[in-house]
Regions:
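Dinucleotide-binding Rossmann-like beta1-alpha1 core, especially the glycine-rich loop
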Residues: 1-69
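Short, solvent-exposed beta-strand edge segments and adjacent coil->beta transition regions
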Residues: 35-37, 82-84, 165
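Helical element adjacent to the flavin cofactor pocket in flavoenzyme catalytic cores
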Residues: 48, 55-56, 60, 79-141
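Flexible hinge/switch segments at interdomain interfaces of large molecular machines
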Residues: 30, 71-79
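General beta-strand structural signal in soluble alpha/beta enzymes
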Residues: 65-68, 112-114, 132, 144, ...
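Generic secondary-structure signature for well-ordered alpha-helical cores
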Residues: 13-27, 59-63, 77, 107-111, ...
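A short small-residue
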Residues: 1-2, 82, 210
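Active-site substrate-recognition segment that forms the wall
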Residues: 16, 24-32, 118-128, 136-210
Length: 210
């Protein structure tokens, strides 16, 4: 429990940083929404996961709210889910729009080089040299945000397992389809069972979509 409390404190620091950036760069609620997160259960095993998770959160001193089948139907418009667990201190981020707006804000003080893939890293004379197909950049420190490609730069050899995830999105729903679907205009559900699927309904510039 103590380890998870410390990790949650780190997570809260990151969320606070993201919230400050959202305010500074004028991000809309469609991009940055402190609406909490629902762990949705569609099976008995999922409900078991949620009950155990709720107990663990209580031991950590964290708030959570149990959502029954009627609550889930009111939110999603569907009777697919048996129940859900809402953790209110989490945030939903439209990551592509967030990164774009974040980059626009940072570009006031830094240079951003897009479409310039780093193909290799060299360390000489106490500095790093990031080499691209058409040039290079040197810096005393480098942050590698490359996920599984960490191995491509010589780190964590034989330590990572690559997992491919896929996503799909509906076309813009018609007004009649939105009425038939029901539920709240925007919501998100993460799977209580680790092998389940995340589902989001959005309502914004691109219309209503799932």
């Amino acid at each position: 429990v103590e380890r998870d409390i410390k990790q949650t404190q780190k997570n809260r620091y990151a969320l606070s940083f993201a919230a400050e950036a959202a305010e500074e760069y004028g991000l809309t609620q469609e991009v940055f929404n402190p609406c909490g997160k629902i762990n949705a259960a569609a099976s008995e095993s999922g409900e078991k996961h949620n009950l155990e998770y709720m107990g663990h959160l209580k031991a950590m001193g964290e708030d959570s709210t149990w959502l029954d089948e009627e609550d889930m139907k009111r939110i999603t418009g569907s009777n697919y889910y048996l129940s859900g667990l809402l953790t209110p201190k989490t945030i939903t981020i439209q990551s592509a729009a967030y990164i774009r707006k974040f980059a626009e804000g940072l570009s006031r003080n830094i240079d951003i080089h897009e479409n310039s893939p780093v193909v290799s890293l060299e360390r000489t004379g106490g500095v790093w040299k990031a080499i691209t197909p058409k040039g290079s950049v040197t810096a005393p420190k480098v942050i590698l945000s490359v996920n599984g490609h960490l191995q491509s730069f010589g780190f964590l050899k034989n330590r990572l397992m690559h997992i491919f995830l896929y996503a799909s999105m509906t076309r813009e729903l018609s007004e009649s389809e939105v009425r038939k679907l029901g539920g709240e205009p925007s919501w998100g559900a993460a799977p209580a069972n680790p092998f389940g699927s995340s589902v989001r309904k959005i309502c914004g510039i691109g219309g209503h979509r799932i």
